[in-house]
Amino acid sequence: SGAILKNYTWDIADGNVKASVLEIDLNDPYVQLEVVPGKGKFTQRATVSNMANRTDAIAMVNGDYYNMKAEGAPIGTTVIDGELVSSQSYLTGVYCLGITSDRTAFVDEFSFSGSVIAANGEKRNLSGLNKTFYWEETTGLHSHIGRLHLYSDLWGGSKRGMDSYVGTPAEVMVKDNQVTAVAFDGGFDSAVPEGCYILHGDG
């Protein structure tokens, strides 16, 4: 009862145009909206129909934009179960659809700021969380050159933000806020282990 599918057809000179609209009642307690990343993690690509079948969803839409020539991770902000899992890229005019805890829908722009603090107290800014490489629209700079990025175990790929412009990055494995391993000369050649983070730096 909380989801109604409506189909529309418009006749035009060259034929007709069809549109399917799903009307959702956010006040219905039996309705739940979720974010579904690919086959379960970022970079693990899947079609919309495959994701719907895997999760038994009654409907699904492609809710973000992706650089399919890169790792296929979302460009925009992603929040799952109230936790930020993908930060906003430094691009202009990118809006996000969100649902608040009281089930109110909104559309707005987001920004991201983050930092890491070393044991000696030194602080460095983070440029992104679970982001593939891109060119920043505001500065024209490469997103990963001379920057720090953080990757969680939701990032399914063995490479993080790498393209031909990036040099030889170094990576730090973190678990429970403790450094467990360091990899120079290109970083770790594996996905992020469950319960861990990888801090990726270049330059």
Please place each PLM-identified region on the residue numbering:
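Gly/Ser/Thr/Pro-rich low-complexity, intrinsically disordered segments
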Residues: S1-G203
